[in-house]
């Protein structure tokens, strides 16, 4: 069967789509895949490296922009709709799968016009605008948290399934992770990461907090993002021999496996990964995201006792150091958080979603062939 996948702009939309794509090929060995994105989104570099055919459309955002930018974005989206219809006509998919981002809007609308079944995978507790608008057309919408249900229109078929993560996240061993990072089993390891691009204020307060920590055997792996590596390195200076500073980590499965605790933003993919790893963490949601969706994500874990959540506004290094000290030294707290994370984790999410998609696509193809046979 043929599966057309769309979603992009950020890794939070792309990597779940790739996990679903991999699961589809496992369950349908004859699967043909086409990924539709933009030339300027990160998907243009990431998807071809995954060995998936990639097609391009025009698209543009219209949310939280000025009037002129919204008009330009709308015109690009209209052109993208026509281009998406062309891709659908040529590829003839049995189903279209959207994971969000403004690129998905024209493709999902084209699927609706072409009468191709579509499904949506939402990553956040507060759904993105593209997925909320397209949900009415969808055969199914997969949501990772029950809290997301309230934000979709009545009558939408919502299916609870976690955010897909790479199998390597769950399978990486603690021993291999520590070996890769030059850490011993006796070390108490804290991993800090503010997202793939880093974050200035997050990195600044995190580094100052680390310098205030007094935890026996502490080792810190601080992933700054390329942009802020120099600033954070200067901030630590020669005061932090126990800190391993990295601009980017290409081996995140091993990094997670090596950790005893984490300090992160609250992007959907990061939260799915710490759930699968059952990694007790302090979360500082980014205040610079649409609809404040990272705080919605973080609070869903906090309510379940699965994370400590701190707001960035007004956060002092001393406050953060106190929270991290508690996380690193209170074993009873860490055990409760690991248990709570295990309850919300869904390591089989990609396979669950793919199985449903294959079933819907098969029904669609059979119905189409039955109509032709009349």
From Swiss-Prot:
Transmembrane segments: none annotated. UDP-N-acetyl-alpha-D-glucosamine binds at residues 10-12, 124, 166, 196, 294. The keyword Cell cycle applies. Keywords: Cell cycle, Cell division, Cell membrane, Cell shape, Cell wall biogenesis/degradation, Glycosyltransferase, Membrane, Peptidoglycan synthesis, Transferase. It holds the Pfam family Glyco_tran_28_C. The keyword Transferase applies. Its main location: membrane. It catalyses: di-trans,octa-cis-undecaprenyl diphospho-N-acetyl-alpha-D-muramoyl-L-alanyl-D-glutamyl-meso-2,6-diaminopimeloyl-D-alanyl-D-alanine + UDP-N-acetyl-alpha-D-glucosamine = di-trans,octa-cis-undecaprenyl diphospho-[N-acetyl-alpha-D-glucosaminyl-(1->4)]-N-acetyl-alpha-D-muramoyl-L-alanyl-D-glutamyl-meso-2,6-diaminopimeloyl-D-alanyl-D-alanine + UDP + H(+). It is an enzyme of class 2 (transferase). It is a peripheral membrane protein. Pathway: Cell wall biogenesis; peptidoglycan biosynthesis. Belongs to the glycosyltransferase 28 family. MurG subfamily. Cell wall formation. Catalyzes the transfer of a GlcNAc subunit on undecaprenyl-pyrophosphoryl-MurNAc-pentapeptide (lipid intermediate I) to form undecaprenyl-pyrophosphoryl-MurNAc-(pentapeptide)GlcNAc (lipid intermediate II). This is UDP-N-acetylglucosamine--N-acetylmuramyl-(pentapeptide) pyrophosphoryl-undecaprenol N-acetylglucosamine transferase. The gene is murG.
